Amino acid sequence: MLSATKRYLATAAAAAATNTTTTSKAFTNTTSQLGRATLTIKDGPVFNGYSFGANRNVSGEAVFTTSLVGYPESMTDPSYRGQILCFTQPLIGNYGVPSSTAKDQFNLLKYMESPKVQCIGIVVADAALEYSHWTAVESLQQWCKRSGVAAITGVDTRQLVSYLRDKGSSLGRITIGEEYDADEDAAFEDPGAINLVHKVTTKAPFHIACPPQYSKGIHIAVLDCGAKENILRCLVERGASLTVFPYDYPIDKIANKFDGIFISNGPGDPTHCSTTVNNLKKIITNHQDLPIFGICLGHQLLALASGAKTIKLKYGNRAHNIPAIDLITGNCHITSQNHGYAVDANTLSENWQPYFTNLNDLSNEGMIHKYQPIFSTQFHPEAKGGPLDTSFLFDKFFDNINVYKKSNGLNLPPVENSLLVDILPKERVE
């Protein structure tokens, strides 16, 4: 008896021979329609390939992600601001790109992590110029061109990633054209030398109201260092309304008007955010019962505010499958990560203790205050993309908020009746 697979292949072959069936269009990755492009690593190798994105030259920090899926989420993640992102997955673009403007029931972007592409360029081994997925509205090539993102395909990404792994994250540039002099004296721009958070934060406070059917009467202040949409979604879907502030807003002056403080992810060197660090110091000192939760850059800023130090990793951790151990329970979780800096756990003060540790490189992945309801993680519990193993940390934050509200007998006015909320816009201010 023929197996199901053999029967399918036999039927498909017969149908193809008689041309009596319609088949989906094959993925065509021909480079005949593409112009030449070059990726140059500063003081390193040069890779020739083909341009399938915007016709512009770009430079920035070259980094890589080993994530198998989620390229729309990665490319719109503000933590990738100013970077040239290399995908180790050989074929990228085969399921296209979904709508960049579609919203969910919370008025948050449904598929993207921010309103626009944040990385300045992408590098792939094989770009799928055709796509197939029910949510897709355009190809990766069309999206890159429309968004002004340089994109190069036909690159030996294994060689590139091996170099970055051994030498560390390096500056790179993508140039478009038939001929390019690799020795040309052109600047390699270092995004790490500037305050990237200032470029991705909201320019003014705005409010996200929790729909009545979800609301639990909780009001959280969010410091937007480049917050991913799914982080905001994880807070709202648990019953909180959010007031989102620019990263350097003097939140310490109004912290007592909120049930909790959240510090988001974001790009670049945390030491550039000294104003935020000083504001957090005041909150930790003057509002000792107030629940605080930080993710990624938010974790690093809390660490700096507590007196600890941060370090730049050799090539960073950017993947959807990194194991991190909970040092309190001993449980191991698979986490989604995207960062080039980390907290030096050896510099934590006596009031803090490590919460999670990366089992690949033993870098710090979280910390928790011994006496106050404050904790933070280097990894992304909201995922998108990635596993949901650590989504319980949002529940932990809300548990802390409920204890805080109950123990302090808080009876704040309804969130939506606040004068502050009434005058704020309802979406991010670019």
From Swiss-Prot:
GO-annotated molecular function: ATP binding; carbamoyl-phosphate synthase (glutamine-hydrolyzing) activity; glutaminase activity
Broadest EC class assigned to this enzyme: ligase
Record-level GO cellular component terms: carbamoyl-phosphate synthase complex; cytoplasm; mitochondrial matrix
Catalytic activity: hydrogencarbonate + L-glutamine + 2 ATP + H2O = carbamoyl phosphate + L-glutamate + 2 ADP + phosphate + 2 H(+)
Primary role: Small subunit of the arginine-specific carbamoyl phosphate synthase (CPSase). CPSase catalyzes the formation of carbamoyl phosphate from the ammonia moiety of glutamine, carbonate, and phosphate donated by ATP, the first step of the arginine biosynthetic pathway. The small subunit (glutamine amidotransferase) binds and cleaves glutamine to supply the large subunit with the substrate ammonia.
Family stated for the protein in its record: Belongs to the CarA family.
Protein name: Carbamoyl phosphate synthase arginine-specific small chain
